[in-house]
UniProtKB/Swiss-Prot annotation:
Protein name per UniProt: Calcium-binding protein 4a
MF terms (GO), sorted A to Z: calcium ion binding
GO cellular component: nucleolus; nucleoplasm
Alphabetically ordered keywords of this record: Calcium, Metal-binding, Repeat
Binding site for Ca(2+) 2: 59, 61, 63, 65, 70
Subunit-structure text: Interacts with numA/nucleomorphin in the presence of Ca(2+).
Gene that encodes it: cbpD1
InterPro entries referenced in this protein's UniProt entry, alphabetically: EF-hand-dom_pair, EF_Hand_1_Ca_BS, EF_hand_dom
Residues the record lists as binding Ca(2+) 1: 23, 25, 27, 29, 34
Highest rank taxon of the organism: Eukaryota
Residue span, EF-hand domain: 10-45, 46-81, 85-120, 123-158
Residues given in the record as Ca(2+) 3 binding sites: 136, 138, 140, 142, 147
Keyword rRNA-binding: no
Gene3D superfamilies assigned: EF-hand
Length: 162
């Protein structure tokens, strides 16, 4: 997954390029007319539809203009939703190890999960030790959903809650 920083940099650059290409009055925004002219110049099949769709999606203050911040804000919401969905799937997949369904994974549950997943006993112990070393942030010998979520955010460099 792309980091939030990379996502915002790419998005900002692309939006700035689009605004630069179509901004006729130099206000660093694209009016409805400027958007229409830009898409007409690029030979979009239906520039009116594209213009109206973009304004509907991204013109958050409904002033009839698009700014870089409006596009970033609108898309960041989608990014956060996707990141949260991926995090939930990741945590849920690991929490299959929680055999007694108490919302905590013990070392024994982790070891057994790795055995059930095809590891031999020695490998399962190594994997369980590694998992607890990396994820059990409060050293209470249990892994919670929140610890696993925080680990995933750091490990995969995604920051959906910032």
């Amino acid at each position: 997954m792309v980091t939030k920083k990379e996502f915002l940099e790419d998005l900002t650059n692309a939006t700035n390029e689009m605004i630069k290409a179509g901004d006729k009055n130099g206000d660093n925004q694209l009016s409805k007319k400027e958007l229409y002219e830009l898409f007409k110049k690029c030979k979009y099949p239906n520039p009116t539809l594209v213009t109206n769709s973009l304004l509907e999606l991204f013109d958050l203050d409904k002033d009839g203009k698009l700014s870089v911040n409006e596009v970033k804000t609108a898309l960041l919401v989608d990014y956060i939703i996707e990141a949260e969905t991926c995090l939930k799937k990741f945590v849920d997949s690991i929490f299959k190890a929680d055999s007694n369904k108490d919302n905590k994974i013990t070392w024994d549950e982790a070891r057994q999960f790795f055995v059930t997943s095809g590891s031999n006993e020695a490998q399962a112990k190594v994997f369980a030790n590694s998992m607890f070393e990396d994820v059990d942030s409060d050293d209470d010998k249990c892994i919670t959903r929140e610890e696993l979520r925080e680990y995933a955010i750091e490990y995969y460099e995604i920051y959906p809650t910032e």
